[in-house]
Amino acid sequence: MQTDLSDSSLFNHKSVMTDEILVSVDQYPLISDNKLTAIDATLGGGGHSYQLLKKYPDLKIIGLDHDPFARQSAFIKLEEFKSRIEICPSNFANFEPKEKVSFVIADLGVNSNQIDNPQRGFSFQKDGPLDMRMNPLLEMNAEDLIETLNEKDLADLIFKFGDERLSRKISRRIKKDLQEKGKYSGTKDLAYSIAGCFPPKQRYRKIHPATRTFQALRIAVNKEIEALERFLELAPNWLLPGGIISIISFHSIEDRLVKNSFKGDERLKNLTKKPITPNEKEIENNKRSRSAKLRIAQLK
């Protein structure tokens, strides 16, 4: 069954660290200028852009997202600011602005809609197809990926992108299952099989044993690391002198890339020696924010 793109109720996402994002862009030296422009490189449901447009009455934002469901939701949420928001169907790795901007923000997390909507195939909490594509136009989904890769390459992928120590055992089990039954019936079927690779005591911990493998498959399907590396190279070129770039990451691979880029890029001044993390109140209200890390840099 195809998800109805017009049903905005399906997109219910809490943007993380919104207050901290607002504080970060306040560091732009010309923040009081009446010609502020920004790029929200991961528009999602429009949560961060909404707060920015609300706070800065003269701000104009270019919002990027390759997920049509996200763009539709953002269009509805940001209706009152329609004269100041331009929504572009683009991945941040493939974008080139016409003019330089005052600041760039990016939230690298998977949005709640993608997780909670079983038809997107990101989660094992509710059964759905093994899809995991943020952009439904991508050719390869998660089912294609596990069928195409050989056992060694699949194990390497799960270890590299999921930091999963049982990657070889999991890969062996997946390829054996595919050989015996043809394919998995859905996300729960795959998650159950992965859980069976763990000792009984580890199957019922707070974090589901399939979490790391699902993360690895999602990253690979969407080429997230390649896209982030490209974005980190491009984004400083989008900024005006003194411009701010603020990036929220959610796992160690992303955070390491952002940290090293901000420290090593001669174009940038790193403004966060250590990442900023959510406060206790936000974590209490939105448990998915607990792993978020915000890093900020400024164009020299």
Swiss-Prot record:
Protein location: Cytoplasm
Family classification: Belongs to the methyltransferase superfamily. RsmH family.
Gene3D superfamilies: Putative methyltransferase TM0872, insert domain, Vaccinia Virus protein VP39
E.C. no: 2.1.1.199
Top EC group: transferase
Keywords: Cytoplasm, Methyltransferase, rRNA processing, S-adenosyl-L-methionine, Transferase
Record's protein name: Ribosomal RNA small subunit methyltransferase H
Physiological role: Specifically methylates the N4 position of cytidine in position 1402 (C1402) of 16S rRNA.
Top-level taxonomic group: Bacteria
Organism (species): Prochlorococcus marinus subsp. pastoris (strain CCMP1986 / NIES-2087 / MED4)
Keyword Signal: no
